[in-house]
Amino acid sequence: MFILSKIADLVRIPPDQFHRDTISAITHQLNNKFANKIIPNVGLCITIYDLLTVEEGQLKPGDGSSYINVTFRAVVFKPFLGEIVTGWISKCTAEGIKVSLLGIFDDIFIPQNMLFEGCYYTPEESAWIWPMDEETKLYFDVNEKIRFRIEREVFVDVKPKSPKERELEERAQLENEIEGKNEETPQNEKPPAYALLGSCQTDGMGLVSWWE
């Protein structure tokens, strides 16, 4: 689930960090830049593990900061394909089940076609149901512990909203308030920069309580 990933980067050390020793200053800046952020095509960076190489610092004209080329290793959350993972159901929709690894990662989705054969969604209870036989129905309920298999990882280049897009959204929201409308302004929900797709289709998968 966690790997060590080797990364090279140019680190900027601002003057207010000069009181630190070089290694501490570099590690501090790297954690600010990478920790708890998605590294494209790598995974979710948890923390900086160690520094492998540190070159001499360079100064740029008109800038009091020091620039240092470094190679380091980072602890990265990146489950391998086929890995069996345990999480908690955070949401059920007609499209499938959203799973959270509490405090670590929330963008995990099990699509409806990756659930056990015969599973169906009940809007009244906001839950998925697996009918094992005519008399036994097993529920996928929110906040239940679920075991699943990693089938695919998805990286998306998510770009920040432009000033024009933000201006249009704010204007639409203001118009709604003036007209006394309570509905929220429709917004295009952007996909997460890194997401995992899972499956529950084999023995032992599904709610952990079923198999205890």
From Swiss-Prot:
<dbReference type="GO" id="GO:0006383">
    <property type="term" value="P:transcription by RNA polymerase III"/>
</dbReference>
<feature type="compositionally biased region" description="Basic and acidic residues">
    <location>
        <begin position="166"/>
        <end position="184"/>
    </location>
</feature>
<dbReference type="InterPro" id="IPR013238">
    <property type="entry name" value="RNA_pol_III_Rbc25"/>
</dbReference>
<dbReference type="Pfam" id="PF08292">
    <property type="entry name" value="RNA_pol_Rbc25"/>
</dbReference>
<feature type="region of interest" description="Disordered">
    <location>
        <begin position="166"/>
        <end position="194"/>
    </location>
</feature>
<dbReference type="InterPro" id="IPR036898">
    <property type="entry name" value="RNA_pol_Rpb7-like_N_sf"/>
</dbReference>
<dbReference type="InterPro" id="IPR005576">
    <property type="entry name" value="Rpb7-like_N"/>
</dbReference>
<dbReference type="GO" id="GO:0005666">
    <property type="term" value="C:RNA polymerase III complex"/>
</dbReference>
<dbReference type="GO" id="GO:0006384">
    <property type="term" value="P:transcription initiation at RNA polymerase III promoter"/>
</dbReference>
<dbReference type="GO" id="GO:0003677">
    <property type="term" value="F:DNA binding"/>
</dbReference>
<dbReference type="GO" id="GO:0003899">
    <property type="term" value="F:DNA-directed RNA polymerase activity"/>
</dbReference>
<dbReference type="InterPro" id="IPR012340">
    <property type="entry name" value="NA-bd_OB-fold"/>
</dbReference>
<dbReference type="GO" id="GO:0006386">
    <property type="term" value="P:termination of RNA polymerase III transcription"/>
</dbReference>
<dbReference type="InterPro" id="IPR045113">
    <property type="entry name" value="Rpb7-like"/>
</dbReference>
<dbReference type="GO" id="GO:0042797">
    <property type="term" value="P:tRNA transcription by RNA polymerase III"/>
</dbReference>
<comment type="similarity">
    <text>Belongs to the eukaryotic RPB7/RPC8 RNA polymerase subunit family.</text>
</comment>
<dbReference type="GO" id="GO:0005634">
    <property type="term" value="C:nucleus"/>
</dbReference>
<feature type="modified residue" description="Phosphoserine">
    <location>
        <position position="162"/>
    </location>
</feature>
<comment type="function">
    <text>DNA-dependent RNA polymerase catalyzes the transcription of DNA into RNA using the four ribonucleoside triphosphates as substrates. Specific peripheric component of RNA polymerase III which synthesizes small RNAs, such as 5S rRNA and tRNA. The RPC25/RPC8-RPC17/RPC9 subcomplex may bind Pol III transcripts emerging from the adjacent exit pore during elongation.</text>
</comment>
<dbReference type="InterPro" id="IPR004519">
    <property type="entry name" value="RNAP_E/RPC8"/>
</dbReference>
<keyword id="KW-0539">Nucleus</keyword>
<comment type="subunit">
    <text>Component of the RNA polymerase III (Pol III) complex consisting of 17 subunits. RPC25/RPC8 and RPC17/RPC9 form a Pol III subcomplex.</text>
</comment>
<keyword id="KW-0804">Transcription</keyword>
<keyword id="KW-0240">DNA-directed RNA polymerase</keyword>
<dbReference type="GO" id="GO:0005654">
    <property type="term" value="C:nucleoplasm"/>
</dbReference>
<keyword id="KW-0597">Phosphoprotein</keyword>
<protein>
    <recommendedName>
        <fullName>DNA-directed RNA polymerase III subunit RPC8</fullName>
    </recommendedName>
</protein>
<dbReference type="Pfam" id="PF03876">
    <property type="entry name" value="SHS2_Rpb7-N"/>
</dbReference>
